[in-house]
């Protein structure tokens, strides 16, 4: 079977009067490669699904989902990897005749953070609530339908939160407030984030404040990033967003020298990936010109530097204490997961 965004091949056989077995694999443009296995009763089979990389933006990988028919519906077990570390989940899909279908999440564990709750599918949409706790994170995610629209509201707070991703992530304090409103096939987003003391591996950011307002994928986002305590780094930026393009302008200071984008940085959707046309970043008397492409398939980054002060690296890695300046080029390509080629001059 083939379609513009889906290819699938499989085979199966009937194993009894009302039982069968089926195996197949394919690729979907958004969710990547997948394997599917069905076996058991024709009307209530066991289902096993493996997704290689269903949501790259969240770092989801090797996602396994298994459904088993039980009294009252299906039990489910899921697991995989993510940017925040490994996750696992189990619960029930309740299909009681005469009642709304419901997903009961008994356990959704990401690193040490747990979410539990029940979400029902009503005539108007999804209704329910997931309660989040543990690992330094507390709050909830609310699902509320009505008047032809679906609201998803997240209120989450973090204090000394840690996630076992690769590399590990830690957050001293953070508050996320987000409303996602789905209306007639379009999505509206109003989100605010305030965070301090964020680290990912050796990268450290002192403070982040951001706000985004999008209507059906278009709108604006503003954010401010500052260095750790004692740092003089601060950068303010604004992004004009459409579904196929992000246009970012911004400027700031570090150690008394101006840091700015000479022209807006653009991210453009092209096919199944994104491109960054040549953009120049000026810092003090130096500059760096970069262009890139990333997404499925081949990815690349081209960077050319002229008299760029090395102290700029101290923004994210404050203990390095580098001095001097750098001239040269860096070309990085990635043609397959886990393989990279780097050229320097």
Residue ranges of each PLM-predicted region?
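Interface amphipathic segments
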Residues: 1-345
């Amino acid at each position: 079977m083939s379609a513009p965004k889906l290819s699938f091949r499989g085979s199966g056989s009937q194993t009894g009067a009302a039982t069968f077995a089926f195996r197949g694999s394919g690729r979907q443009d958004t969710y990547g490669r997948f394997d599917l296995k069905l076996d058991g009763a024709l009307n209530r089979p066991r289902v096993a699904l493996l997704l290689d990389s269903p949501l790259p933006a969240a770092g989801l990988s090797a996602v396994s989902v298994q459904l088993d028919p039980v009294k009252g519906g299906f039990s489910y077990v899921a697991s995989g990897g993510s940017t925040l570390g490994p996750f696992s989940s189990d619960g029930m899909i309740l299909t009681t005749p005469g009642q709304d279908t419901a997903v009961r999440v008994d356990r959704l564990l990401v690193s040490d953070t747990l979410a539990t709750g029940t979400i029902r599918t009503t005539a108007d949409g999804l209704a329910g609530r997931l309660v989040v706790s543990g690992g330094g994170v507390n709050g909830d995610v609310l699902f509320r339908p009505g008047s032809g629209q679906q609201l998803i509201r997240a209120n989450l707070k973090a204090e000394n939160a840690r996630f076992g991703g690769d590399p590990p992530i830690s957050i001293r304090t953070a508050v996320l407030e987000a409303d996602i409103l789905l209306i007639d096939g379009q999505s509206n987003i109003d989100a605010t984030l305030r965070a301090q003391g964020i680290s990912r591996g050796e990268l450290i950011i002192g403070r982040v404040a951001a706000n985004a307002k999008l209507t059906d994928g278009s709108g604006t986002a503003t954010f401010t990033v500052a260095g750790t305590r004692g740092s003089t780094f601060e950068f303010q930026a604004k992004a004009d967003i459409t579904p196929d393009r992000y246009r970012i302008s911004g400027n700031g200071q570090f150690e008394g020298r101006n840091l700015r984008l000479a022209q807006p940085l653009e991210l453009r959707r092209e096919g199944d990936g994104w491109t960054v046309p040549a953009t120049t970043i000026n810092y003090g008397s130096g500059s760096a010109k970069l262009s890139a492409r990333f997404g499925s398939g081949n990815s690349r980054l081209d960077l050319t530097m002229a008299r760029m002060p090395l102290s700029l690296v101290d923004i994210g890695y404050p203990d390095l204490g580098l001095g001097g300046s750098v001239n040269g080029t860096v070309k990085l390509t990635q043609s397959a997961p886990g393989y990279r080629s780097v050229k320097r001059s």
